[in-house]
UniProtKB/Swiss-Prot annotation:
Similarity section: Belongs to the glycosyltransferase 51 family.
Membrane topology label: Single-pass membrane protein
Matching Gene3D superfamilies: Biosynthetic peptidoglycan transglycosylase-like
Source organism: Pectobacterium carotovorum subsp. carotovorum (strain PC1)
Gene Ontology terms describing biological process: cell wall organization; peptidoglycan biosynthetic process; regulation of cell shape
GO molecular function terms attached to this record: pentosyltransferase activity; peptidoglycan glycosyltransferase activity
Enzyme Commission no: 2.4.99.28
Cysteines paired by S-S bonds: none
Full protein name: Biosynthetic peptidoglycan transglycosylase
Known function: Peptidoglycan polymerase that catalyzes glycan chain elongation from lipid-linked precursors.
Length: 244
């Protein structure tokens, strides 16, 4: 009887601990959604993950680096390039591209070895800022919930600004300011259309693809992005959607 009561007390304590831990995490996410709707983002969850992973591997020279800049300090071509590459419907959806999701599901049923994603810029930003890499249903479920909250509270311009400041462009290189200075020795405000398209071309896998040593695939993707940028209307597209 004593063992039963002790065991029951332990289970109740563990249950309370789990519930409280979940509530703390949810509270932290809600606070992050509110605070980062106007405050600069000092670091992201992916940056922390990369840094800790490097230390655990003994790679003490690795430093996850980013420099926050406002949208006014980012070349319009860079904002247009990431939308052309990753999410051309970004101004119009509420965080999810249902057509792209449907196409990805059909593709993945036929091609189990080459999985296609359908994440919008909003989802990618949420994953980078609050969550972790991976394709688990748990992470995707959390991503969907947080993305909904972000879309309700933030403007599209804010989502794009944060995305551009925390996106990974290479080992230890996070955000367009750090990428522009590392690869082109200039601030993000002076990036050309070609340079912007090259940076956007590595976004699917910035560890495998390098802007400073682009493969033939990256170069082809860069040229495709440039064509898409022209078809979208260039700066006029940004102005029409209040994104510049």
């Amino acid at each position: 009887m004593k063992w039963s009561r002790g065991r029951g007390g332990l289970l109740a304590w563990l249950k309370r601990l789990i519930v409280r831990s979940v509530l703390v995490v949810i509270g932290a996410w809600l606070a992050g959604i509110l605070l980062f709707s106007f405050l600069p983002v000092p670091f992201s969850a992916v940056m922390v993950d990369r840094q800790i992973s490097a230390w655990l591997k003994g790679e003490f020279s690795y430093v996850a680096h980013s420099d926050w800049v406002s949208m006014e300090e980012i070349a319009p071509e860079m904002a247009l390039a990431v939308m052309a590459a990753e999410d051309q419907k970004f101004p119009d959806h509420w965080g999810f591209d249902l057509d792209a999701i449907g196409q990805a599901l059909k593709h993945n049923e036929r091609n189990t070895q080459r999985i296609r994603g359908a994440s919008t810029l909003s989802q990618q930003m949420v994953k980078n800022l609050f969550l972790w890499d991976g394709r688990s249903w748990v992470r995707k479920g959390l991503e969907a919930g947080i993305t909904t909250g972000v879309e309700l509270v933030w403007t599209k311009r804010r989502i794009l600004t944060v995305y551009l400041n925390i996106a990974e462009f290479g080992p230890g290189i996070f955000g367009v300011e750090a990428a522009a200075r590392r690869y082109f020795n200039k601030p993000a405000s002076r990036l050309t259309a070609s340079e912007s398209a090259l940076l956007a071309a590595v976004l699917p896998n910035p560890i495998r693809f390098r802007a400073n040593a682009p493969s033939s695939y990256v170069i082809q993707r860069q040229q495709w992005i440039l064509r898409q940028m022209r078809q979208m209307g260039g700066d006029a597209f940004l102005r029409a959607n209040n994104l510049n």
